[in-house]
Amino acid sequence: MSDKEMNVESFNLDHTKVKAPYVRLAGIKTGDHGDAIHKYDLRICQPNKAHMEMPALHSLEHLMAELSRNHTDKMLDISPMGCQTGFYVTLINHDDYDDVLDLIDKTLNDVLVAKEVPACNEMQCGWAASHSLEGAQALARDLLAKRNEWNQVFA
């Protein structure tokens, strides 16, 4: 790892020292009018050891993006990481870490009882053929089983 500070926060994180699953505050940005954007790293798979398969990841993204908004109006975005090991969860004006954990917990429990993947069609999705409700539910189930570990980022 370079000693030089990188512009991208996650590039400065030593991925060999973290222990998934976890939820960590990755950054806070304050807007010109005082709004605070909180970005959380929701790591599901151990970096460089495992990754989510695309259909399951894609469906979990759709489900969490839709269902999380049933629990908060502070959600801005849930974005998958390119490495396929987790998601970025971005909220506005919401800095209560324990509440964020509860929000993720409630959302994942909603995923477990979902009957379909929202917006899983060619009109609403750019790769509608790449989805797996069962895969997303398996990821949610595994993540919830380790709920007590979410606040432990480093091994």
From Swiss-Prot:
Cofactor stoichiometry and binding remark: Binds 1 Fe cation per subunit.
An MF annotation (GO) of this entry: S-ribosylhomocysteine lyase activity
EC code(s) of this entry: 4.4.1.21
Cofactors required: Fe cation
SUPFAM superfamilies: LuxS/MPP-like metallohydrolase (SSF63411)
GO biological process: quorum sensing
Catalysis performed (reactions): S-(5-deoxy-D-ribos-5-yl)-L-homocysteine = (S)-4,5-dihydroxypentane-2,3-dione + L-homocysteine
Residues involved in Fe cation binding: H58, H62, C125
InterPro entries named in the record: LuxS_sf (IPR037005), Metalloenz_LuxS/M16 (IPR011249), S-ribosylhomocysteinase (IPR003815)
Keyword Lyase among record annotations: yes
Class of enzymatic activity (EC top level): lyase
Pfam families (UniProt xref): LuxS
Keyword line: Autoinducer synthesis, Iron, Lyase, Metal-binding, Quorum sensing
Function (record text): Involved in the synthesis of autoinducer 2 (AI-2) which is secreted by bacteria and is used to communicate both the cell density and the metabolic potential of the environment. The regulation of gene expression in response to changes in cell density is called quorum sensing. Catalyzes the transformation of S-ribosylhomocysteine (RHC) to homocysteine (HC) and 4,5-dihydroxy-2,3-pentadione (DPD).
NCBIfam families: PRK02260.1-4
Assembly with partners or alone: Homodimer.
Family: Belongs to the LuxS family.
Protein's name in the database: S-ribosylhomocysteine lyase
Lineage, uppermost ranks: Bacteria, Pseudomonadati, Pseudomonadota, Gammaproteobacteria, Oceanospirillales
